[in-house]
Curated annotation (Swiss-Prot):
Subunit structure: Heterohexamer, formed by a dimer of trimers. The hexameric TusBCD complex contains 2 copies each of TusB, TusC and TusD. The TusBCD complex interacts with TusE.
Protein name (Swiss-Prot/TrEMBL): Sulfurtransferase TusD
Protein family: Belongs to the DsrE/TusD family.
Keywords: Cytoplasm, Transferase, tRNA processing
Annotated function: Part of a sulfur-relay system required for 2-thiolation of 5-methylaminomethyl-2-thiouridine (mnm(5)s(2)U) at tRNA wobble positions. Accepts sulfur from TusA and transfers it in turn to TusE.
GO function term, MF aspect, one: sulfur carrier activity
EC number per UniProt: 2.8.1.-
Major localization class: cytoplasm
Active site feature: 78
Example of a GO biological process term: tRNA wobble position uridine thiolation
Localization of this protein: Cytoplasm
Origin species: Escherichia fergusonii (strain ATCC 35469 / DSM 13698 / CCUG 18766 / IAM 14443 / JCM 21226 / LMG 7866 / NBRC 102419 / NCTC 12128 / CDC 0568-73)
TM annotation in the entry: none
Length: 128
């Protein structure tokens, strides 16, 4: 079965993102296809490369990145939500005159069209 996940919670502070990550790992372990994860609202903080969790905590941002590199899962973040919350790639940083970018490698700024496409092409869309 083909799945897409929508994450609306930040990397730290709520269970939404960590539950979504554990669900994603379980899907892959059970042989399902996870085509994409769409980060929306506060979920865009999962793509901030400047997060620095304590050494005894799981690094969720890098966990998502590994999911992308090891399993080819597309990590799309809503561009409008990201810009409002200060998560930008190099292109947007340059366009906005910002000194630097902070989008973690493996994540892609995208519009709601990516979520709509996932909804149409997947068997299930699960929101956290």
């Amino acid at each position: 079965m083909r799945f897409a996940i929508v994450v609306t919670g930040p990397a730290y502070g709520t269970q939404q993102a960590s539950s979504a990550f554990q669900f994603a790992q379980a899907l892959i372990a059970e042989g399902h296809e996870l085509s994409s994860v769409f980060f929306y609202r506060e979920g865009v903080y999962n793509a901030n490369q400047l997060t620095s969790p304590a050494s005894d905590e799981f690094d969720l941002v890098r966990g998502w990145q590994q999911l992308n590199t090891q399993h080819g899962v597309a990590l799309n973040i809503c561009v409008a939500a990201a810009l409002r919350r200060g998560v930008v790639d190099e292109t947007e940083a340059g366009r906005l005159g910002l000194a630097s970018s902070n989008l973690q490698t493996g994540f892609t700024l995208s519009g709601l069209g990516a979520l709509a496409e996932a909804s149409l092409t997947c068997d299930r869309v699960v929101q956290f």
